[in-house]
Amino acid sequence: MKETGVIKFNCNWIKSEALPMSELNELNTWRNKMYALGWIGVNAEEIGFGNISIRSKNNEFIISGSATGKLKTLNNEHYTKVVEYDLEKNSLTAVGPILASSESLTHAVIYEYDKTVNAIIHIHNYDLWKKNMNEMPTTKKEIEYGTPAMANEMIRLFDETDLRNKKVLVMAGHEEGIISFGENLEEAGNLLLKLLQ
């Protein structure tokens, strides 16, 4: 059984009203594309996988909520804003109608570490994962998803590989997991679609 979709950080969740849908249209469009491809979804154990985010301002970002992979379509009740995080304390603060995705700390570090990144997509696809393992920047196999170690692994990949240029990474210890990022959702999404070629 593959573990996925389980929150491993301390979340200070400030429940609040949803963001206006007008702020989420492009995010939702790309999330729907990833869902249609089966790259965001739910596994046989009914645990959701995959997530998507956009930078809001500074290091704040809007991300799909926890356990939303099982939903075919999302609305503004399914997104939340991460407003701060502390890697050392394995914690973050999210404001919105839903808990932040289990991979939020990883997104946070990428946004902080590369100011040109404005969108991140985390998908699951076994064939692409296997094909691109060690062809693209790849996390160490012993690193678990959703942990401070995974977030720190992003820093290692930025420092020691050509991740900043490739903008796609494979999560060796998170079966099927691939992350792409870009200046916008179109770039992040198209980098994933290009892997199909």
Q: Where would I find each of the regions flagged by the language model?
A:
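Glycine-rich flexible loops
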Residues: 1-197
